[in-house]
Design a protein with these regions (language model features):
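Catalytic cores of the polymerase beta-like nucleotidyltransferase superfamily
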Residues: 1-473
Length: 473
């Protein structure tokens, strides 16, 4: 049995907490281990984000005792599973009793929890690379327990299950999506038997709560190269159940000159580009859905080939349904709708003469999401022709420079008519109604077209000038 204490830096918070937990175990007469992702990430030299302890006693009682030593006043207990979370500011901690679980067919909720030994607990874990335990007893501190070959799989960059994969994924179907996540996050390959089992059981993901599924999808989008996980979802048949609108893109051709031949793989490239350009999960999500309506709007033109007229506007509407079944927050839904609707606008400016009026309209429409919109448009450049990429980027930089200039000069980001509705009503003796909206719209259009300045005096003068034309229309 090897000892990995040399991997545990002595001056870290994690090391101090582990040694404290080990001593507490001695005081209480119970073995304590650090398990799972923490051990895996020690070997991979990845950031250590949380500590999972396995204890050979009641998990809630041990968590209460450890929290007291850490001066944490309250824990979050789950007595049914003998598990508790300790909200320690320095690093999140979870404590669980060694256990195994049995499941009712068709459900991922355990019907029976049985306390077990170290090997029995590790056997129930999702992948062998997470079925690792380090002994924290002061006399054995750092001793590695690897009963199912996890270290060998870490070195091979391979995801395998401790149990037969059919049993592992049948018990908890969410593990199938987690396989895609770990493959993307760790740049690992899924074992052939596991891949086959996922493909055969893909439909069982339907029994998992939508909130859990969406959370795992978002975790995939948060990786350095999300396409790895997303392509696995498609290849295993999971995408059909997780996000059918994205699955519909697979195999649909589009114009070869500009993009990948396949809409799905073009989208994967856009998501990866967005991941390189930004850490924002919502922007990566926008990259995933920006062409969501292309399958619905795909037509064949005898001269142009495939066309997707209106896929931006149709996509905005489709996202209402998508956000509902994915149970996305309203704020994220509205963000995705806006960027999907507008994602062609900056590109259209690049392809035509760059006028101040066109720039103003994009700035006003995008509002606070302007920077994200421009980043999405950069990510959307996936042509394989390097000369076209160079030309596109040069034109794009011209647009961005002019946009910055116009925005600074005209203060348009939170644009609306400098003359407000109440003043219009008071000036002309009107009540609330469509006439007020018409006057405000006319003022805003004049500003966007460069006919008047974006300031109060010019707007009021223009209002008085056009009132008769608007009110007698």
């Amino acid at each position: 049995m090897s000892n990995i204490h040399h991997l545990i830096a002595e001056d870290t918070v994690g090391s101090k907490v582990m040694r404290l937990a080990g001593k507490l175990g001695v005081e209480r007469g119970h073995d304590v281990y650090v398990v799972g992702g923490y051990v895996r990430d020690l070997f991979l030299r990845r950031p250590l984000k949380e500590i999972d302890f396995m204890v050979m006693c009641d998990g809630v009682e041990f968590a209460e005792a450890l929290a007291k030593k850490l001066k944490v006043k309250k824990i979050v207990p789950f007595p049914k599973f003998s598990t508790a979370k300790i909200p320690y500011k320095a690093i999140p901690i979870e404590v669980a009793a060694a256990r195994s679980e049995s499941y009712e067919k068709g459900s991922r909720k355990p019907i029976k929890v049985v306390y077990t030994d170290l090997q029995g607990d590790l056997l129930r874990r999702d992948f062998t690379v997470n079925a690792l335990a380090v002994d924290l007893h002061p006399d054995r501190f750092g001793e590695l327990n690897d009963p199912y070959g996890g270290i060998s799989e870490l070195k091979a960059k391979l995801l395998k299950t401790p149990l037969n994969p059919d049993e592992t994924f049948s018990e908890d179907p969410l593990r199938m999506i987690r396989a895609a996540y770990f493959a993307a996050a760790l740049d690992f390959t899924i074992d052939e038997q596991c891949f086959k089992a996922i493909h055969e059981q893909a439909q069982r993901i339907s029994i998992v709560s939508q909130e859990r599924v969406t959370a795992e999808l978002i975790k995939i989008l948060s990786t350095n190269k999300p396409s790895i996980g997303l392509i696995i979802l498609q290849k295993t048949g999971l995408m059909k159940y997780v996000f059918p609108e994205i699955d519909d893109m697979y195999g649909l051709e589009q114009t070869k000159e500009w993009h990948h031949k396949d809409i799905f793989y073009h989208t994967m490239q856009v998501v990866d580009n967005a991941a390189q350009l930004s850490d924002k999960m919502k922007l990566r999500f926008a990259a995933l859905v920006h062409d969501i309506a292309k399958p619905k709007t795909r037509r064949v033109d005898s001269k142009k080939g495939y066309t997707f007229h209106g896929h931006d506007a149709v996509g905005e509407r489709v996202l209402n349904k998508v956000a509902k079944y994915l149970k996305l927050p309203n704020e994220l839904r509205d963000y995705l709708k806006k960027l999907t609707l507008l994602h062609l606008r900056p590109i259209a400016i690049v392809n035509s003469e760059v006028t101040d009026s066109a720039i103003r309209r994009v700035i006003v429409a995008a509002g606070d999401e302007l920077d994200d919109l421009m980043t999405l448009c950069r990510a959307d450049i996936t042509t394989r022709n390097p000369n076209r990429v160079k030309k596109y980027l040069q034109n794009f930089e011209i647009v961005e420079a002019k946009m910055s200039n116009v925005e600074e000069r005209d203060a348009l980001r939170a644009f609306q008519s400098p003359v407000r509705g109440k003043e219009i009503m008071k000036t002309f003796g009107l009540f609330e109604g469509k006439e007020i909206g018409k006057i405000k719209h006319a003022i805003e259009e004049a500003i966007l077209n460069g006919e008047i300045e974006n300031e109060y005096d010019s707007a009021r003068e223009y209002m008085l000038k056009i009132k008769d034309e608007i009110l007698t229309d």
